[in-house]
Amino acid sequence: MGLFDRIKGPVFLKESNSLQRQLEALENIKTENEEICQLIQQDIRRLKYGIAGEEKIAFELKNSHIPMFVLHDLHIEYEGLSAQIDYLLVTRSRIFILECKNLYGNIEINSNGDFIRTVQYGRGYKKEGIYSPVTQNRRHLDLIKEIIVNRQTNILKKAAVSKFFYDNYKSVVVLANPNTVLNARYAKKEIKNQVIRADRLTEYIKSVNGSDVLINEDAMERYANFFLSLHKENETDYTARYADMIKNAEPAQETWPADTDSVPLCPKCGAVMVKRKAAKGAFAGNEFWGCSNYPRCRYIINISSGNKP
């Protein structure tokens, strides 16, 4: 049997649907509080964006035809430090640590390595700095290096592993949004080489690996299982904070008939109430009376069903 006769393409040793579970949990939250509904919708949009980005990377990997083991969504803790790794790839010659970014807007990397995003607002444009994903992923890589080096008991081997670590482990930031324009014209080469678009991922892996075959299939699988053994479940509970917010939110104490032209006064502060309509969430489209002193007073009165809107 040839060296890579058994593994013909990517093997997903660990897949993740944690973001999907978080999304479903958020979508199931029900509250009449408009402010909380808006915050929930913001989190839902962020999660959907993240899911779309990771699905794009998964598609590229699954269609790469590259023999490798793929670990998706690893949470590693060591010596008080932690790393949340989007994708870890064990290939025949190198190990790749991928940081998936589904960024909106266009991205510029300047000569200092700063990431600057340009977003269009109406007819104008706004520039804003964002935290460098290269720095973020380098910290993930440094933590893995510390783990790998400290596993070596032989002093000479430990020194060798440390010296050649960055030759064998590669940090890559993958931009998943196909509409994002990347301008890295003035970026230093070492930074530029770590940021690619998703549609170049397969080409990048093949280019870095070249014709090198450094480990066999069994060794690849051992490496993959070792990293899998480091994983610790650490799923973010997006619903917990909303449970507290809903519990502490000012509830509607009464209802108001829909078939009347009279306007109620706020039972809490005495201000005139204003008719509003929930724009999002489980009660989207429902009308209610909200205090005109909002946000200082958050009292609401539900409008009971009737013939008059």
Predicted regions and their residues:
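Cell-envelope/extracellular polymer assembly enzymes that use nucleotide-activated donors
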Residues: 86
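Basic/aromatic-rich interaction segments and small domains that mediate binding to polyanionic partners
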Residues: 295
